[in-house]
Swiss-Prot record:
It comes from Milk vetch dwarf virus (isolate N) (MDV). One of its GO terms (cellular component) is host cell cytoplasm. Belongs to the nanoviridae nuclear shuttle protein family. Putative nuclear shuttle protein. InterPro entries: Nanovirus_C8. Keywords: Host cytoplasm, Host nucleus. The gene is DNA-N. This is Putative nuclear shuttle protein. It is found in: Host nucleus; Host cytoplasm.
C-alpha cells in the first residue's frame, strides 16, 4: 500500500437522517469518486476508510435505550456484509430528553480494478439501526459518513 501514499486523497460524504428508530430503519448510500471524464487515463481507486459519527435523542422517563449502528458494504460477490458496528445508547431517569452520540473509523484499504476514464467508482453501503432495547418512535438519529479515497492514474 505504500505506493498509494503519493496519490491524491478524495472524500465522499453522506448524511443519513432517521427521524424515528421504530422498526429497525436502514438507508442505502453510494460511495462515488465522481471522476468520470475528468482524467485522460484509466485509474485505480483505493477505498481507504469509512468514518462514521452520529448524534440523536430519545424521550421518556426511566428509559434505557441501546442498540447498534451497523455499516454494511455490498462486496464484489454481490453479498452485503457488515464492516462494523458502533454502539448507541443512554439512560434517562426523568420525563425529559436524553442524548447519545458516537464515532468510529473503519479502515478498509480496498483496491479497485482499473477504471476507464468514462466510468465512476461506485460502492454501495447500507446504514442500519439495530434495536437491542427501547429504540422506538420516541428516538431519532442523524448519521454522518465520510469515505476516504485515493486515486491513482
Amino acid at each position: 500500500m505504500a505506493d498509494w501514499f503519493a496519490s491524491p486523497l478524495k472524500t465522499c460524504t453522506h448524511v443519513c437522517d432517521f427521524p424515528t428508530l421504530a422498526g429497525d430503519p436502514s438507508q442505502e448510500i453510494t460511495c462515488c469518486d465522481s471522476m468520470k471524464n475528468k482524467l485522460n487515463d484509466s485509474r485505480k481507486v483505493l477505498l481507504v476508510s469509512c468514518s462514521v459519527s452520529f448524534n440523536g435523542s430519545f424521550y421518556g422517563g426511566n428509559r434505557n435505550v441501546r442498540g447498534q449502528l451497523q455499516i454494511s458494504m455490498l462486496e464484489d460477490d454481490g453479498v452485503c456484509r457488515p464492516i462494523g458496528y458502533v454502539p448507541i445508547g443512554g439512560y434517562l431517569y426523568h420525563n425529559d430528553y436524553g442524548y447519545y452520540e458516537g464515532e468510529k473509523t473503519f479502515n478498509l484499504d480496498i483496491e479497485s480494478q482499473y477504471l476507464k476514464k468514462d466510468e465512476d467508482y461506485n460502492r454501495k453501503f447500507i446504514v442500519s439501526v439495530l434495536n437491542e432495547n427501547g429504540l422506538d418512535s420516541l428516538c431519532d438519529l442523524k448519521v454522518f459518513i465520510v469515505h476516504a479515497l485515493r486515486i491513482k492514474v
